[in-house]
Amino acid sequence: MQDITQAEAIHWLATQQKITFLTGAGISTASGVPDYRSLKGVYQGIQQPEYLLSRTCLKTEPEKFYQFVKTLYHPDAQPNIIHQKMAQLEQMKRGKIVSQNIDGLHRKAGSQEVVDFHGNLYECYCQTCGATVPWQDYLLSDRHADCHGQIRPAITLYEEGLSEEAIEKAIQAVASADLIVIVGTSFQVHPFCDLIHYKQPTATILAINQTPLFLQQPYYFLEAKAETIFAELTIKE
């Protein structure tokens, strides 16, 4: 790990042509969405949070699963400066985004090709008939009005495998980057943190976080709130 200055980090973001962002829940806290493991996070005070987001809970205690998942929705949350600047870089073909987040804020900010590695809360479907169901309907009932099947969000639960398409797209995004920027994540959840092994030998890793990461590879570290850095970033056409 090597520390860098805020000015250096901003310069890299402003000038690099092939950036891939690996993002986590920490980038959405400025939008009012709590992260998972901080003191104010979603899991605080809840016993067995992983169980509540597991396939077993969905199948055996669907009501308990449903009541917990509903607390993860923040439909009034708006993208912040981090999402907005990343979307701008994506639209200029300079940035790609692979996100652990299921809050949909990257897409809300205008990102078209974000890889939702763990899925999206705002995409729901009926497990019985396969129909797409508006998330607004899901928040009213987890039973499909047409067939009475169980509705669920299209997110990856504990005990479930990830989408092959998401994995392939994420690997491609990392492998094509000259600069990989890790933002708002402790980078400890597998297989998300394993994506870094697909980077080019010449690619640079930059972590913008409030605590250092445990990476086996050399990386540059800026201890900062990401929203502060992205607010200072000027992107020229």
Curated annotation (Swiss-Prot):
Zn(2+) binds at C126, C129, H144, C147. Belongs to the sirtuin family. Class U subfamily. Keywords: Cytoplasm, Metal-binding, NAD, Transferase, Zinc. Its EC number is 2.3.1.286. It catalyses: N(6)-acetyl-L-lysyl-[protein] + NAD(+) + H2O = 2''-O-acetyl-ADP-D-ribose + nicotinamide + L-lysyl-[protein]. This is NAD-dependent protein deacetylase. It comes from Enterococcus faecalis (strain ATCC 700802 / V583). Nicotinamide binds at I102, D103. One of its GO terms (cellular component) is cytoplasm. It comes from the Bacteria.
